[in-house]
Amino acid sequence: MNHELPVISLFSGAGGLDCAIESCAEPPLVQDGSGSPLRVAVATDYEQTALDTLSANFPHTKTLCGDIQTIPTAELLEAGGLKPGDPTLVIGGPPCTPFSKSGFWIEEKRNSADPNASLLDEYVRVVRESKPEAFILENVQGLTYKTHQAQFDRLIAGLKDAGYNPTFRVLLAAEYGVPQLRRRVFVVGRRDGKAFHFPETTHSGESERDRVIDHTKIPFTSLREALAGLPDVPEAGEVVEGTYAELAAEVPPGQNYLWHTDRYGGRNEFKWRSRYWTFLLKADPDRPSTTLQAQPGPWVGPFHWENVKNANGEERARRFRVAEMKRIMTFPDEFVFTGVKREVQRQIGNPVPVELGKVVVRALMEQLGYLDSRGTTIPSQAGHEQLELI
């Protein structure tokens, strides 16, 4: 083994958490090329397009495409040039549809009967058999809901049985400087039995649940701040057309379809609370974005707060462009996405925001003794191969 600390990445997608892994030595919210002592040795996903994106950005990472249920842990280790006990971390976010709001209306998903829910067991299997020093699992907060308690309890029990001490917490990305009101649950565990301590929040502002602002912290990062400096380059398919095109264009920034009810100033087209909150939702430039979705419907926001003209000169709402979505998800501007727009939207909308992942990875690496509080690699920990299994 070389001095780089190897990581196994499961359900990698386009590499959001992988990007956090390979930049964790950078200060929070800074992309200065400081790098990381960690390197993703091998990554898996069932979508080749997502792995093409990952390979375009991390050419040193070996990739395996396929259903994780058919990939033995030994094959993962071999692809990464590893043996049990070698990986510093196992990371990943199993497909979240069974636990997300977007899939909640399907009864089998409410009850965690969706086949994808069993992928949590596959994550536990790889952790148990590869014996990393620690692991990070992330998912939508819906995984912690009472409707999924049996599945979540099974996950925690499995990780404990594998010899780890898992702790979990739902984190709001905006509270760590990400320009998005996106909540993700993180489950983190160490093989040495010590508990992981989650990093303190650094930012404060109004969210969909909290109107109390802590003025001792940094204000939330607004969309206007996050998207500043991007060139105004139109993209194909960005104009919102169809049945509700005119209504979407008339919605003010920060409002949604409720603008067109009898309680607000628009047309009286909809009944109060008859649609999803994201229906015809227009972003507020002075606040963080609401959650970007991986597979939004044609009239599902958030849309950009500024309208554009269509080919006929009519005013229309527009969707966020790829460069803008990368900023909202805190991917580096130079990060390359492969595939058609629909595939890119899914790749950007699925992962944890990079900077949210980075603060968790950085905290774990500090607590394991690989980084100091400034993000500097501690030389005495370079001999990772000397660590013994517990």
Curated annotation (Swiss-Prot):
Residues 5-371 form the SAM-dependent MTase C5-type domain. Gene3D superfamilies: DNA Methylase, subunit A, domain 2, Vaccinia Virus protein VP39. The active site is at C96. It catalyses: a 2'-deoxycytidine in DNA + S-adenosyl-L-methionine = a 5-methyl-2'-deoxycytidine in DNA + S-adenosyl-L-homocysteine + H(+). Its EC number is 2.1.1.37. Keywords: DNA-binding, Methyltransferase, Restriction system, S-adenosyl-L-methionine, Transferase. SUPFAM superfamilies: S-adenosyl-L-methionine-dependent methyltransferases. It comes from the Bacteria. The keyword Repressor does not apply. GO terms for molecular function: DNA (cytosine-5-)-methyltransferase activity; DNA binding. Transmembrane segments: none annotated. GO terms for biological process: DNA restriction-modification system; methylation; negative regulation of gene expression via chromosomal CpG island methylation. InterPro entries: C5-Methyltransferase (IPR050390), C5_MeTfrase (IPR001525), SAM-dependent_MTases_sf (IPR029063). The keyword Transferase applies. Belongs to the class I-like SAM-binding methyltransferase superfamily. C5-methyltransferase family. This is Type II methyltransferase M.SacI. The lineage of its organism: Bacteria, Bacillati, Actinomycetota, Actinomycetes, Kitasatosporales.
